[in-house]
Amino acid sequence: MTVLTREKKPYFGLTGGWLTFWVTVACATDMSLFGYDQGVFSGVVITRDFLEVHDLVGPEKTKTLSTVTAIYDVGCFFGAIVAFTIGEQLGRKKAILLGTTIMAIGAVLQAASFSLAQMFVGRIILGIGNGINTATAPIWQTETSQLKWRGKLVIFEMMMNIFGFCLVNWINYGLSFVGGSIAWRFPLAFQFFFLIILWSTTPWLPESPRWLIAHGRQEEATVVLSCLEAKPIDDPFVIAQRNEIEFSVRYERENSMRWRDLCQKKGNDSKTLRRLLLGAGSQFMQQFGGINIMSYYLPTVLMDSVGLSDTMARLLAACNALSYLVFSGLAVLLVERIGRRGLMLLSTFGQFLCFLIITILLRFSRISDNGEKFASASVAFFFLYYGAFGIGMLGVPWLYPTEINSLPMRTKGAAVATATDWITNFVVVEITPIGIKNIDWKFWIVWTVTNAAFLPILYFLYPETANRSLEDMDEYYRSNPALVVTKDPDAICRRRPQKYLQREEEEIERAAAAVDKRALSVGAVEHAEWTNAMGNKS
């Protein structure tokens, strides 16, 4: 058992904002690597040397090429399942270290590949590691962040995801002038830059206090909470936080549901299944909003659908990544002001509008004498699509499952959401080259319709999680809320509802009273001992 002392200074003496900063460095590095991996193959698959080495030259190889690209997402899906099955036992830190080590093996296999089979295996292994990490990092960040910073920091992670995506697009563009094997081997090997940072930071950072309490390690959790808040371990606020987490853990254990119960739709009063589906649904909508048509294939799309040259397609993809980074940065500023619901609605509407206009322009480019001008005009809306996606549907679907699910279900819920993301990602990446080749401009109608369909789902079914503690969401679902959230003003308002503020104040007052009572008791005992000692001397 850990012995707590005031003199003990874990985490190199870092507390408060600085400790949160270093947790964010680790989580943001993980998400930067995720973004890097999303973009790296867009340049690899149009590199002549890569295609020749792996016997992928020619239109008859389109199906194989789409599969070797998409198989990474299958690996990510199974990685999320691994996180779902053993992540709760390992803890947040160990799960990330496991995922990082697996990714290193996959990166070596890819960068050193001389056969299609080796590339397949490397991409699957890399995906497994990434699936573990992407299912875990947002939870770790969420559970170690103060309420006022939680949303901003997770969205910042996704901004760093786009930094990785932006970086690799410029690397791909620069290496296109070099040619040869280095044009694709170097970008694949550069993943070790991120992996080394993860190995260097994660081991010494704090474990999630919520995970520690859920596994009976209350003393360690109290130390972590006091360090994260930069307060003494007996501070009323720290004690109140610990008590709230303990209550949520006890409540969920008393009312917990097995997976069999979820599938049989047996009810319980914390709405576990509904919360699980809302979190997974946000990831489903992210992928079928069409983003990974662009992330994996933008140069291909610009060459095949718009008619641009290889060099111009790579350059525009790199420039687009910069604007994408700017819009993802705006989300950090807006996520608490507009809320999770507002950003998802705004983002999805923007995506719908962009795909609608892209569809119309590409249709006219096929039937008009000025077809080239219509095709060129569509490029602007590919850029704007990234902007619309970046301000909302980029980050919120990664944040939402970590907030909406209860503590005992948080790892499982985030893993199910991540698995949903990756299996739908695989579908999108697999069908894109085939769809563009076979149905041309009509392919874009599909994504126009899906985005339009998501708008009423988001508006009527998704409650707001901004400016709520994780325990607030547990209390909300214990109140047996209606399925349609627009009926309850507290469910959709951006500010923290008054009833949760009042409950927190009462808990702090009780904790302070308990501390005072304990201090008085200790003082009385010390006084009695001193009196007895003086009496004995007499």
Curated annotation (Swiss-Prot):
The record's annotation in InterPro entries points to:
MFS_dom (IPR020846), MFS_sugar_transport-like (IPR005828), MFS_Sugar_Transporters (IPR050360), MFS_trans_sf (IPR036259), Sugar/inositol_transpt (IPR003663), Sugar_transporter_CS (IPR005829)
Q: Which GO terms describe its cellular component?
A: membrane
Write one Gene Ontology MF term: carbohydrate:proton symporter activity
Topological relation to the membrane, as annotated: Multi-pass membrane protein
Any one Pfam family match given in the protein's UniProt record, by short name: Sugar_tr
Glycosylation annotated at which residues?
268, 467
Outline what the protein does: MFS-type transporter; part of the gene cluster that mediates the biosynthesis of oryzines, natural products with an unusual maleidride backbone.
Can you say what this protein is called?
Answer: MFS-type transporter oryC
Lineage, opening ranks: Eukaryota, Fungi, Dikarya, Ascomycota, Pezizomycotina
